[in-house]
């Protein structure tokens, strides 16, 4: 089983069709890995603020 996401409402599901809007769900792809992390500064600041 793969996790899927509804493109219309953004809800995550394991089914082929969304239970909320009956739209066909699509496979979720992880973000591409890059050694140059464009958003690392923001993630670290957010993590530090939560501590």
UniProtKB/Swiss-Prot annotation:
GO annotation, cellular component aspect: ribonucleoprotein complex
Cross-referenced InterPro entries: H/ACA_rnp_Nop10, H/ACA_rnp_Nop10_sf, Nop10_arc-typ
Disulfide cysteine pairs (residue numbers): none
A GO term for molecular function: snoRNA binding
A Gene Ontology BP annotation from the UniProt entry: rRNA processing
Entry-linked Pfam families: Nop10p
Keywords assigned by UniProt, alphabetized: Ribonucleoprotein, Ribosome biogenesis, rRNA processing
Keyword NADP: no
Bilayer-crossing regions: none
Entry function: Involved in ribosome biogenesis; more specifically in 18S rRNA pseudouridylation and in cleavage of pre-rRNA.
Family: Belongs to the NOP10 family.
Protein name: Ribosome biogenesis protein Nop10
Species this protein is from: Methanococcus maripaludis (strain C5 / ATCC BAA-1333)
Gene: nop10
